[in-house]
Amino acid sequence: MSNEYVTNLEMLPTKDITDNHINGSLTVIWRDWDNILKNYPKMVYASSVLPGEIKGPHIHTKRTSHFVCIHGKVVFVLKKSDGKYLEIISDAKKPSMVHVPKNIPSAHVNLSNDISTVLTLADLACKHNDNEMLNISFDDYDWSKWKKSI
């Protein structure tokens, strides 16, 4: 699925140099000439989330973020400007980039039984005490449906 919030990523097999057997894979997350990102990243980081745990929800007032689950499986929950929720599953085995524009609140839940790792590319580097991120709540959202996945 590719749309304004999701871009499917290219995953290529890698081969052993001696006999050409498949020895892994390479996932292309960002190339300058792909034009996936409107602004080049100013900050890149990896964060982990424990099994069954929720990160967020929060809102970035100045920054657009792009997320890729590089280990495990998570669901991103975005609250669009019309108040409707969008749920996007991101899995390291089927990589996709989730785009969260500034002022769109989001959270993510680890759906795997192990720690999941999310790589973030942001168009604005965070600075301590810049008050750019606001914690909020999704009071009308049913978080319990994701607890069954674990």
Residue ranges and their predicted role:
Residues 109-111:
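Asparagine-centered strand-capping/turn motif at beta-strand->loop junctions
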Residues 94-107:
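Conserved SET/PR-domain catalytic core that frames the SAM/AdoMet-binding pocket
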Residues 1-97, 113-150:
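Non-catalytic, conserved peripheral segments adjacent to functional cores
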